[in-house]
Structure formats: structure tokens, C-alpha cells
UniProtKB/Swiss-Prot annotation:
Free-text function comment from the UniProt entry: The beta subunit is responsible for the synthesis of L-tryptophan from indole and L-serine.
Record-given protein name: Tryptophan synthase beta chain
GO cellular component: cytoplasm
PROSITE patterns reported in the protein's UniProt record: TRP_SYNTHASE_BETA
GO molecular function: tryptophan synthase activity
Catalytic EC class: lyase
Reaction(s) catalysed (UniProt annotation): (1S,2R)-1-C-(indol-3-yl)glycerol 3-phosphate + L-serine = D-glyceraldehyde 3-phosphate + L-tryptophan + H2O
N6-(pyridoxal phosphate)lysine: residues bearing it: 98
Cited Pfam families: PALP
Cell wall biogenesis/degradation keyword on record: no
Length: 405
């Protein structure tokens, strides 16, 4: 469908990196030249067909794209309503969608002549994907990870070390993703000349939110093509989990100007929105500035960032990507939530009915699917982004279910 650019939901951000009132560049003076250099380098790379050709080659031969669009027939039968499809990004090399973005950014870092890579990680999937591309291209890699997340994601910590990365434990705050990102930003300020900060989600100062979205949009572009081949039409709805929101933005963005497609982002409701122990920034937060951009944040009356809670390390972030905040305000996407308990139930159901063990992150998206699927007509086509596999979560889930391993 052709849409006037001025009326398009896909035309952002503006030249200042804003999506409406969200986004922008709120960084220390020391970092501003780096962020501007990155913006310029990314614009040049986008205009160079050789850059995209290199990404396409690596996506095919190294990552294993395109990922399949899979009809979850037994789940569909179980609910007796909507036809449920999974976009199988958990089948990518390294087990999640994170590699899509890491590949694009590592190729950009090399173009810029950077010789050291740093990153933050929560669930460890972005850390593993970053360590993977650094190993592939022979670049040293430092990963910042909160001590709480290190404890609940031990397999991924070992994978990062095996891949040659240095994993730096972060003890400040609650030892989760927000704290890891703070430390990575401190490192970047101190090592401005040679270091590239490979941010893992659609947050941070401009151009990161747009750049990460662009590298992840392969998910939605493939889905659109695959759905037209399979069903001869676009899906009726899209569902994806939201931490910072890169897997969701990757699925949603190519469909934003297709008004017939309903879009649902699923935040982590933790112990319940009413308890205050959750990570649902849009449902329980307010606009503010964190990590270089203006967006919805969990904060107290004084504007101090509150610590969130989620069973899922990858959703345990007190903010959300600025483009999601804008889509929420414009009403183009609907943001809902799922609790720890609901995600655990969906995790088990998917494993038993489809033979697919999902990561706890997409288990939140599936939890929402389970709430609405049965009430939808049988010709309703729903696509859920299965953005990660659950190997990393089996120990944590066993613990929550009271199973001793």
C-alpha cells in the first residue's frame, strides 16, 4: 500500500532523532561527537549497496535466514479460534533475534575503523550474539552484565566467555539490564577513540533506536513475504514481547502503514501491575529521560528510576524504545501485559503442544495470544514473534516450578 510520507507511521525519526516528543539525543558532551560520527557513518553505509550485500550474505550463510513462518497447528486447534503462526527467529544462529542487529552493527563498526566492542546484556542473548560476531571478525569484546542476571543466566555467561568475551559483573543498583547499560555508557565515555558501543535494543541516543530497528526489520519483511505466499494476504494481527522492544519493532515496522493489521506489544507485568513489581513502562510509567532518549519510564514522583521486576531477564528494563512510546501515544499499536505466572503457563503449554521450548521473553507474547485466540474467528491470521529459544531459561523455570535439577 502506498502512503503519503507525511502521513506514514514509517517516516520517523526526524533529523533530531525524534518520534513525536520521544527519542532524541540526551548525552554527555564527551559523547556527542561519537553519536554524530555514528549517525554520519550509518547514513553513508545505508547508501552503499555493498554494505547491504554483505549483511544479506552473512544473514543467509552465517545466521541461517530467512527464518521459517510456522503454523502452530496444535495450539491453533487447542484454542479453536485464530490461526496462530510463529515467526521462528529462535532458529537463528545463537538462538534469538539479537544476531540480526549485532551483525549489522559489527559491519558498521568495522567500516568506522573501531577496534574494540562493548555491549550490555540482560538475558545474555545480546551478549552472546555480540561475542559471536566479535569472534567471527576477530575483535576484542567486553560485555557488561548485572550480577542478578549473571546468576539467572549462567549458561549464557559461559557461552560468552567461551566465545572470547570478557564479562564484567555490574553490582550497582539491582544488578540488571539498566545497571549494565549505565556501566557500558561509562566505558564508552572513557574510551571514545577506539571503542564501538553495540547497543542491543531500540533505545539509547539517536541513531541507535532507528538503526537497531532497521537491522531487525528483516523479521517483518520476511513475515510479510511469507504470509502472502502462504495465505495470499497480510496477517490480521501481530504479537511480540517488549523489553526495550527490538524484536517487536523488527516485526511491526514493515506493517505500520497497513491499517488492516492490528499490532500488540506485550510488556512484562511481573507479579501484577497493581503490585508495582513489574516492567510495564507504558502501563505503569511516565515520560522521562534515560540512556540518551526520552521515553516512558518506571519512575517515582521525584523522577527517580524505579527498579522493575520480571521473571524474564530480557524484559527486566524500566523503559521502552522511544518509537514504541510514540506508537502507543498515536494509537497505532496496542500495548498490553502478561504476568510471570501467565508467561510460565504459556512456556509449558508451548513446549507440550508444539515441541518448541520458548524463551521466557516470547512466552509473555504467547501468554497474550492464549488470552485472545479462542475468541477470534478461525480465519483470523495471527503472527507471534518467537524471538528466542528457552534453553537459557530451563534452570530458572525449574526453580520457579519447584523442580530440583
Amino acid at each position: 500500500m502506498s502512503v503519503n510520507k507525511a502521513n506514514s507511521f514509517r517516516s520517523g525519526p526526524d533529523e533530531r532523532g525524534r518520534f513525536g516528543i520521544f527519542g532524541g539525543r540526551f548525552v554527555a558532551e564527551t559523547l556527542m561527537p561519537l553519536v554524530l560520527e555514528l549517525d554520519k557513518a550509518y547514513a553513508a553505509a545505508k547508501a552503499d549497496p555493498a554494505f547491504q550485500a554483505e549483511i544479506d550474505f552473512m544473514q543467509r550463510d552465517y545466521v541461517g535466514r530467512p527464518s521459517p513462518l510456522y503454523l502452530a497447528a496444535r495450539l491453533t486447534e487447542h484454542f479453536g479460534g485464530a490461526k496462530i503462526y510463529f515467526k521462528r527467529d529462535e532458529l537463528n544462529h545463537t538462538g534469538s533475534h539479537k544476531i540480526n542487529n549485532c551483525l549489522g552493527q559489527i559491519l558498521l563498526a568495522r567500516r568506522m575503523g573501531k577496534t574494540r566492542i562493548i555491549a550490555e546484556t540482560g538475558a545474555g542473548q545480546h551478549g552472546v550474539a555480540t561475542a559471536t560476531v566479535c569472534a567471527r571478525f576477530g575483535l576484542p569484546c567486553v560485555i557488561y552484565m548485572g550480577t542478578t542476571d549473571i546468576e539467572r543466566q549462567k549458561p549464557n555467561v559461559f557461552r560468552m566467555k567461551l566465545l572470547g568475551a570478557e564479562v564484567v559483573p555490574v553490582t550497582s543498583g539491582t544488578g540488571t539490564l539498566k545497571d549494565a547499560m549505565n556501566e557500558a555508557l561509562r566505558d564508552w565515555v572513557t574510551n571514545v577513540e577506539n571503542t564501538y558501543y553495540l547497543i542491543g535494543t531500540v533505545a539509547g541516543p539517536h541513531p541507535y533506536p532507528a538503526m537497531v530497528r532497521d537491522f531487525q526489520s528483516v523479521i517483518g519483511e520476511e513475515t510479510k513475504k511469507q504470509m502472502l505466499e502462504r495465505e495470499g494476504r497480510l496477517p490480521d494481527s501481530l504479537v511480540a514481547c517488549i523489553g526495550g522492544g527490538s524484536n517487536a519493532m523488527g516485526l511491526f515496522h514493515p506493517f505500520l502503514d497497513d491499517p488492516s493489521v492490528k499490532i500488540y506489544g506485550v510488556e512484562a507485568a511481573g507479579h501484577g501491575l497493581e503490585t508495582g513489581e513489574h516492567c510495564a513502562s507504558l502501563k505503569g510509567g511516565a515520560p522521562g529521560v534515560l540512556h540518551g532518549n526520552r521515553t516512558y519510564l518506571l519512575q517515582d514522583d521525584d523522577g527517580q528510576i524505579k527498579d522493575g521486576h520480571s521473571i524474564s531477564a530480557g524484559l527486566d528494563y524500566p523503559g521502552i524504545g522511544p518509537e514504541h512510546a510514540w506508537l502507543h501515544e498515536t494509537g497505532r499499536a496496542e500495548y498490553v501485559s502478561a504476568t510471570d505466572r501467565e508467561a510460565l503457563a504459556a512456556f509449558q503449554l508451548c513446549s507440550k503442544l508444539e515441541g518448541i521450548i520458548p524463551a521466557l521473553e516470547p512466552a509473555h507474547a504467547l501468554a497474550f495470544v492464549t488470552k485472545i485466540a479462542s475468541a477470534l474467528p478461525k480465519d483470523h491470521l495471527m503472527v507471534m514473534n518467537m524471538c528466542g529459544r528457552g534453553d537459557k531459561d530451563v534452570f530458572a523455570v525449574a526453580d520457579h516450578l519447584g523442580v530440583t535439577l
